[in-house]
Amino acid sequence: MKHPSATPELVIFDCDGTLVDSEVVAARAWSEYVAGYGVTLSPEDALARFRGVSMKWCISHIEQLHGQPLPAHFEQELRALMGGMLEQHLQPISGAVEIVEQLHVPFALASNAPHHKIELCLRVTGLLPHFAGRIFSAYDVQRWKPDPALFLFAAERLGVAPQRCAVVEDSLPGVQAGLAAGMQVIALQEHGVHPELPAEVAVITHLAQLRAKLG
């Protein structure tokens, strides 16, 4: 694994699966909701298929399984179900609160999710005050990971060159976006390393290990 030669000037965190344990909750919502359309999708399958990808991609996949287009209200109702479940069950990823309280490097958040979902997740987990004014959504640029546009947008808005940024991600699309942006990438792999993870990516298994990787 490669290590940075100098401490980055900006750390850009992903949200889902990196700071908040929302992907497990969202997978349960997917499984429950699509059952009403006659689609069998276990929470485990939803988690494996939908980790780190856009809502548009997920809906397209469900339409293929369903065999016909889904109604216009599908996304709105699904997001409402997810929102309620997140309010009730969402927890921060282990070490997330501590790392944002202790990190001495400026940091931001960049997620494929819309702002309202990001802010919901951060509010429920107590992380929102730490990211005031530094939250970026793929909906801001209309480009979703693995496209690097979101990370480049965040770096530009905060006045930091891409090569001086470090990205912290849990998903392969997020890792690919960070690499394509020319940034250092650190992958949080709590449950085993993804077999397709590029060799140049530094790996941590707990957020407590992040500071050591930042140099």
Task: Describe the predicted segments one by one.
Residues M1-E9, V105, P114-G215:
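Asp-based, Mg2+/Mn2+-dependent phosphohydrolase catalytic module
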Residues A27, S31, L47, M55-S60, ...:
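An amphipathic alpha-helix signature
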Residues Y33-V34, S54-Q68, C121, A155:
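Helix-loop "lid/cap" segments that line or gate small-molecule binding pockets
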Residues G84-L109, H115-E119:
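Short, acidic loop-to-helix structural element flanking the phosphoryl-transfer center
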